[in-house]
């Protein structure tokens, strides 16, 4: 039975005590826009590096394409996103799940993913839509991402240089598990489609050793009203993690929640721009 009603997740299992330790550093209205396209913004964040060798490394983070079919808007979104990514040419590119609505669009998205900068190490996680769309099985999604140049992480990790990326399964539809061990000598980057997923698995060790959490799913609310902000977030914690940069008071862990690139079943955005996020470790 679905726990989502009017864009809010009313799941019984919540970790309110873990949520209290997080504070918002920057909101939607405080975002730093590096470049503004016709449809997509490139927003920037600077995150403290735990190790000197990590300083200066760049990550492009994007999520929630939700593409429905070949049309001029979607082609323009991909074109602007590709231009931004090529200009930055980052060390890492990460995708946060919820790819398409219809299987017929997969070739277009694959071509886009394959066109991203070749030198960048690329990873992805699954979203709830990858489970809802039953025309592709789990192994097919892995093959799709591999053919696109991305490594799919489902409760698993991969290491590049001084970084360890850990990707979770989807909290709502999958079987989410945390890592068995968390090393001390790596820059730990957690990839979770929904911010709720990291809250779900973040015990003290994970929290203290993680440098950065990257999430999407909320679409920044997709429809934001003056003085109210996001109305619908599909989060168990409603607007707590709707968008922006968050820091944990206890562990100094950073979390970035993106507004995404597409739309949910409601094909409308109001005062909530599509975005790619550029994260630089400093």
Label each PLM-derived region with a short phrase.
Residues 70-160:
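Core catalytic region of metal-dependent phosphoesterases/phosphodiesterases
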Residues 220-225:
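His/Asp/Glu-enriched short active-site or ligand-binding loop at hydrolase and phosphoryl-transfer sites
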Residues 60, 94, 123, 189, ...:
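Hydrophobic "anchor" residues on beta-strands that sit immediately upstream
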Residues 1-42, 247-282:
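Acidic, His/Gly-rich catalytic cores of divalent-metal-dependent hydrolytic chemistry
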Residues 5-112:
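N-terminal active-site segment of His-dependent metallophosphoesterases
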Residues 226-231:
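Membrane-interfacial alpha-helical segments at the cytosolic side of multi-pass membrane proteins
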Residues 49-52, 66-68, 128-212, 218, ...:
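Conserved catalytic scaffold of divalent metal-dependent phosphoesterases
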């Amino acid at each position: 039975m679905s726990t989502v009603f009017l864009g809010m997740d009313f799941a019984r299992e919540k970790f309110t005590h873990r949520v209290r330790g997080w504070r918002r550093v920057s909101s939607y209205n405080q975002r730093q826009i590096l470049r503004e396209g016709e449809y997509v913004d490139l927003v920037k964040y600077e995150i403290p590096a735990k190790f000197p060798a990590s300083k200066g490394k760049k990550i492009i983070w994007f999520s929630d394409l939700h593409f429905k079919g070949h049309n001029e808007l979607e082609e323009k979104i991909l074109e602007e996103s590709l231009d931004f990514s090529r200009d930055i040419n980052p060390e890492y590119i990460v995708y946060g799940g919820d790819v398409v609505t219809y299987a017929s669009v997969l070739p277009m998205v694959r071509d886009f993913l394959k066109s991203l900068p070749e030198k960048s190490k690329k990873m992805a996680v699954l979203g709830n839509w990858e489970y809802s769309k039953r025309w592709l099985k789990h192994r097919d999604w892995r093959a799709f991402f591999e053919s696109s140049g991305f490594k799919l992480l489902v409760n698993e990790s991969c290491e590049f240089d001084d970084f360890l990326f850990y990707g979770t399964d989807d909290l709502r539809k999958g079987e989410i598990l945390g890592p068995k061990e968390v090393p001390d000598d790596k820059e730990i980057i957690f990839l979770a489609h929904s911010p709720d997923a990291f809250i779900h698995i973040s015990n003290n060790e994970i929290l203290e050793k993680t440098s950065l959490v990257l999430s999407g799913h909320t679409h920044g609310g997709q429809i934001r009203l003056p003085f109210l902000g996001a109305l619908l977030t599909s989060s168990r914690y409603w607007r707590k993690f709707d968008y922006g940069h968050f820091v944990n008071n206890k562990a100094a862990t950073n979390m970035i929640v993106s507004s995404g690139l597409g739309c949910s079943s409601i094909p409308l955005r109001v005062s909530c721009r599509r975005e790619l996020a550029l994260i630089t470790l400093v």
